[in-house]
Amino acid sequence: TTQIPRSAADDFQPDVTADTHVGAVPSAVPPKRPNADFAGDPTREPIAFDSPREPAMDSAAPEDDIHLIPGASIAGGRYRLLVSHGGPPALQFWQALDTALDRQVALTFVDPDRTLPPGQVQEILTRTLMLSRLDKPGIARVLDVAHTGSGGLVVSEWIRGGSLKEVADTSPSPIGGARAVQSLAAAADAAHAAGVALSIDHPSRVRVSIEGDVALAFPATLPDATPEDDIRGIGAALYALLTDRWPLTETGAPSGLQPAETDPAGEPVEPRAVDRTIPFQIS
């Protein structure tokens, strides 16, 4: 692969080019970055929206299969898909354009391949609905939760910044990384107090905002997610920022992070063993 110079994390602005317009379908090779990561961007201003409601089991009649490709329009043309961000099994994460409000959003498709029982899809949506009550920098604001003809859809605000992999590639300082994950830990604490887990189960779930907060960018709580899983996920996010590697088992679409090196017992080596400059207290 071609090596490119690493920029400072504070200079990192990873979104689609400024020539993306409402009504224009991206080319076959979609822009890699949306144009939202700039100070004063109106997409960060509060907008009026109906609070997410409990999704009904007897939703509308099944639609044709949704083709999740860049440029595709869904929900009657309301959202245009821009960039796929992967995801664990049964979920797909997309960056999209809300064509009605001309702002970027994060879309989480729940069971788009229809492999889960309907009751399990309902449980995911019900748990995710509980996250809509949280207002923390460490979680994207949930704007809508709904059934579709092929599963479910969670619409969230778009976290401007970079993916965990992109920011880890800039070699942020250990202290900066430790501070950044505090926002995710605070969001998890609030979610656990409300009786729900965040489901931090995949590197692509997490983004680092331009404000420097590590956040759950694609909310959708799986039925088997636990607070203990979240604690491991928070630790894994910090590990990735420190070492550019992922210490947990990764399933689903690859995030680009390499797996962590392991010790003779099969456990991930401590970050300090990878980089001796990492303070012992953080490692």
Language-model features: locations:
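Conserved N-lobe loop of protein kinases adjacent to the ATP-binding glycine-rich P-loop
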Residues: 87, 97-104
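Protein kinase glycine-rich loop
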Residues: 81-89
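C-terminal lobe helix-coil module of Hanks-type protein kinase domains
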Residues: 222-283
